[in-house]
Amino acid sequence: MIVLLILSLACTAFTYRLQGFTNAGIVAYKNIQDGNEDDNIVFSPFGYSFSMFMSLLPASGNTKVELLKTMDLRKIDLGPAFTELISGLAKPKTSKYTYTDLTYQSFVDNTVCIKPSYYQQYHRFGLYRLNFRRDAVNKINSIVERRSGMSNVVDSTMLDNNTLWAIINTIYFKGTWQYPFDITKTHNTSFTNKYGTKTVPMMSVVTKLQGNTITIDDEEYDMVRLQYKDANISMYLAIGDNMTHFTDSIMAAKLDYWSSQLGNKVYNLKLPRFSIENKRDIKSIAEMMAPSMFNPDNASFKHMTRDPLYIYKMFQNAKIDVNEQGTVAEASTIMVATVRSSPEELEFNTPFVFIIRHDITGFILFMGKVESP
């Protein structure tokens, strides 16, 4: 039996809104949170859903039906959906402050017979032929690094002599805050979780932001939107007494509604610096949504090949760094906003959730929670 590896890589940057696509990634995040309630988490819902979408293109039979249902794409022609998906984020880097970079690579072993129709339709998006038994790790890493700038994305534990197909997508986001935090005002202060209190570097800025208190089943949460400079991308921060309940309530339509309820306010915002890196085997999560593609007897990818491929591994590596300048930030001139009214105090000194969202498409590039900065 022939096997397939899907590897989703993410590093913490349209008018047709693919909410089902976004929701599939959100559901995957919720499954990751279950059993990891006390851990810092960073995950790319977009990276996860994009890998599932790229598995859908060659899928047929029940495998295709399950993937369509997972992303609620049953009434959508995949050709236009794919074009909109790629064009939604894969834009030229037009700003020195904030950009996203999306790449996709499909590596197929030379022994697999690809249908000419499939090759003609999708080869321009990054379809490569190679011998997986001859230095495949170095060859794949070299191609991915050349296209995305990310190094060593695969290792020998992810590929083996059974691997005949590897799908790798990368999304890199680099953002500078619209109103950066003043590094001279960062001070050590307390952060408290259920295990106690620790001292962390707490950033501070006084400026006008969009924020509000939202209510979910009688639970109140403070939410604020931090915009990135020269971009349609924002980080949404939420804090409250029951953050698991907040996360359980998140869906694409809910985020649309909550963001529409945020109004302009003057905040004295305090946010800890944080850096999170997670490497996860997410096969079991994807298997709950689309089980047949992981089953060697039931998987079908006949739109691409008649060879009996099935998926046997799925990973995601994700990383995020947040500091005074922004997210994965480079040095920049600090802008300080002057305000007249008394600012509303909002300090993220207990566990909180963050969501980095492309505001036009609704795509969630990254989301996670900070239990201990």
Curated annotation (Swiss-Prot):
- One MF term in GO for this entry? serine-type endopeptidase inhibitor activity
Q: Name one Pfam family in it.
A: Serpin
Q: Cite the CDD domains for this sequence.
A: serpinO_SPI-3_virus
Concerning its family, UniProt says:
Belongs to the serpin family. Orthopoxvirus OPG040 subfamily.
Q: What does the protein in this record do? A: Prevents cell to cell fusion via its interaction with A56 protein. The A56-K2 complex associates with components of the entry fusion complex (EFC) presumably to avoid superinfection and syncytium formation.
Quaternary structure annotation from Swiss-Prot or TrEMBL: Interacts with A56 protein.
Under which name does UniProt file this protein? Superinfection exclusion protein
